[in-house]
């Protein structure tokens, strides 16, 4: 069992189907350590972390991928970001009194919308939206790919507060199998086998054992794992830029309202950035991010 977070790609040698497995423990623990989430919220957030990791392993881009779910229900917001450098962070907002033990996606995020955003460093920003109408986040993501007429893609996701795991299957353009009926039958066969996967197996088995148990009659080629890690992209410079964007008059007014100390908290990691009168003055005197001030988690 690996001691780092990773995704791992695999191929079915005789078909036009690829797969990806995601395993997050350290980064999942980092996300949960920042906020005290109830178990159902932590589970959904873990599934979204695994989904983002799978998508970054599947989609080719240089920039940032954002998965965001919004709802008027007990969980108004789930949000995960994963960069092409394979750095992940996530957050949830919830109404504690409305979160029932054992509740699933339908109960926690009724009438919800799931947004997938790819924000490349160069080129056009892409955004797709799908209703959260499935029984699970995996169902919703699979439905998104079906509705958007992309390559047939299926997801299996589970998380238990300690480990977040995901499996993805994707049908590639015709190469090895040219016959349309044969391609369809092969795809349905592989998906049907994956549908037998239990949460206990996905969360408890290593990748080699899992694939052998599912596809012992198939020729599966497993590639080297690629690491993932938790990292928040917040910084003192970004916080200073946000204050600068207010304009000098508004920033100084905010400073007076806050008794001489403006505090900017990162919603993802709880890092605190403090700006006093000297810092604010330097912001508007070309001083960049201001003089050093105390920061804390």
From Swiss-Prot:
Protein name: 33 kDa chaperonin
Biological process per Gene Ontology, one example term: protein refolding
UniProtKB keywords: Chaperone, Cytoplasm, Disulfide bond, Redox-active center, Zinc
Chief place where the protein resides: cytoplasm
Localization of this protein: Cytoplasm
S-S bonds: 232-234, 266-269
Function of the molecule: Redox regulated molecular chaperone. Protects both thermally unfolding and oxidatively damaged proteins from irreversible aggregation. Plays an important role in the bacterial defense system toward oxidative stress.
Gene Ontology cellular component terms for the protein in this record: cytoplasm
InterPro entries on file: Heat_shock_Hsp33, Heat_shock_Hsp33_C, Heat_shock_Hsp33_N, Hsp33_helix_hairpin_bin_dom_sf
Pfam families given in the database record: HSP33 (PF01430)
GO terms, molecular function: protein folding chaperone; unfolded protein binding
Domain of life: Bacteria
Recorded family membership: Belongs to the HSP33 family.
């Amino acid at each position: 069992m690996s001691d780092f977070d990773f995704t791992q790609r695999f191929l079915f040698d005789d078909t036009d189907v690829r797969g990806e497995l995601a395993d997050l423990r350290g980064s999942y623990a980092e996300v949960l350590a920042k906020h005290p989430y109830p178990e159902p919220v932590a589970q959904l957030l873990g599934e979204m972390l695994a989904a983002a990791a799978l998508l970054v392993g599947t989609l080719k881009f240089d920039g940032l991928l954002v998965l965001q779910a919004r709802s008027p229900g007990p969980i108004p917001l789930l949000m995960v970001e994963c960069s092409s450098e394979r750095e992940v962070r996530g957050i949830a907002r919830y109404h504690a009194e409305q979160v029932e033990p054992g509740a699933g996606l339908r109960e926690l995020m009724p009438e919800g919308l799931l947004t997938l955003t790819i924000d490349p460093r160069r080129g056009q920003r892409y955004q797709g939206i799908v209703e959260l109408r499935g029984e699970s986040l995996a169902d919703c993501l699979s439905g998104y790919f079906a509705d958007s007429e992309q390559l047939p893609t299926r997801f299996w996701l589970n998380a238990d507060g300690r480990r977040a795991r995901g499996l993805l299957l994707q049908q590639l353009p015709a190469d090895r199998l040219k016959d349309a009926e044969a391609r369809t039958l092969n795809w349905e066969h592989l998906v049907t086998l994956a549908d037998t996967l239990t949460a206990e197996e996905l969360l408890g088995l290593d990748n080699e054992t899992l694939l052998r148990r599912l596809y012992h009659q198939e020729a599966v080629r497993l590639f080297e794992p690629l690491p993932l890690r938790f990292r928040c992209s917040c910084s003192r410079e970004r916080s200073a830029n946000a204050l600068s964007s207010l304009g000098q008059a508004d920033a100084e007014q905010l400073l007076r309202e806050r008794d001489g100390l403006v505090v900017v908290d990162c919603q993802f990691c709880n890092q605190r950035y403090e700006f006093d009168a000297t810092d604010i003055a330097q912001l508007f005197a070309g001083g960049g991010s201001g003089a050093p001030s105390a920061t804390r988690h």
